[in-house]
Every structure is written in structure tokens, then in C-alpha cells.
Amino acid sequence: MSDDFKINDATYSGTKEVDQNLKFDTNLLQDWMHEYIPNCESISSVEQFKGGQSNPTYKILTKTGAYVLRRKPPGKLLPKAHAVDREYKVISALEETDVPVPKTFGLCDDHDVVGTPFFMMEFVEGKVFWDHLLPSCSKTERAQIYRDKNRVIAALHGVDYSSVGLAVSYTHLTLPTRLPV
């Protein structure tokens, strides 16, 4: 791989101060959190994750825990783009399966809270690898990571999507019963 295309994990990992155009009133979020997250204490800090391209993602710290907020970006968007509601539905549905996902706390479509629809989930400590070749890992670490990835893929394949509420209907794709000759 050319050095021009190497991805530096540190560049995209971790958090930063929230971009000015993505800030929101933490008092309104705090009120929402008190309603949806049991025993939630006051927000002590809000940071924005560095990585990602689509939906702004924040680390919310309180005295009792760390949470992640994913929201639609502000501004004019394509109708089906940035579907945080779909992300929430899938993650929530997988909570009771063998697929490791964070616990979700709620989906909010009230624009008055943070300006756009969002959902909250627990923060899970870990490392994000932006380069799939895992150059910062030893051979042993890479082998373990790939085994874990395969285990999770197998767990996904084992999910009965209908029973967890993720069945998809394709009735809108039916072909005409009579084709022109």
C-alpha cells in the first residue's frame, strides 16, 4: 500500500472539542437524559468523535457513566439519508442476541432537544481500527482481532431477523403480472 493511502488510526480515533456548527444546548439534552436513562447524573462534558463521515457522534460524560449520542447533521439532507432511526432500530433489535452491541436508551425525533433527531447508547471502551490491515498490531493481536470479527459475523448470520423485528418486506418490488409483448 502506498504511503499516500495509509490511514493513521490516531488521526481519526478519539475525541475533540465539538465543532462550532454542531454544538447544542446541553441543558435540553440533560432533561431528555434524565427521562430516558435510569439514575443519570448531570452532564460533565460533551466531546465529538474525530472519525466518521456521516452522522455527527458525541461522547457524553456524566458522573455515573459515559454515553454516545448519534444525530443527523443539521441542514438540508436527502430524504432517506442519515437514518439514525434505522441505526437505532437495528442496534436495539440486536441487544438480545449474541451480536455484541451497546445498550440503547432511546430515539428522539424532537428537534428542540439537540436540533436534529438522535439516539443515545452506552459508550463501550475499545479501539477503532481505521486501517483494515491493522499495521499497529502484532501478528498475534491481528489473529485475535480477525477471529473476533469472524465470531461476530457468524453471530450476525445466526440472527433470526424476523423474530427480532428486522424483517424487510419487498412487496413494493413486485413485478407486473402481465408483461408487454
Which residues does each predicted region cover?
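ATP-binding pocket architecture of kinase catalytic cores
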Residues: 44-173
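Membrane-targeting and insertion segments and their boundary/processing signals
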Residues: 2-7, 31, 65, 123, ...
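Single conserved hydrophobic/aromatic residue that forms the stacking wall/gate
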Residues: 172-181
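Juxta-kinase regulatory segment immediately upstream of eukaryotic protein kinase catalytic domains
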Residues: 3-38
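Secondary-structure boundary/capping signal
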Residues: 37-44, 179
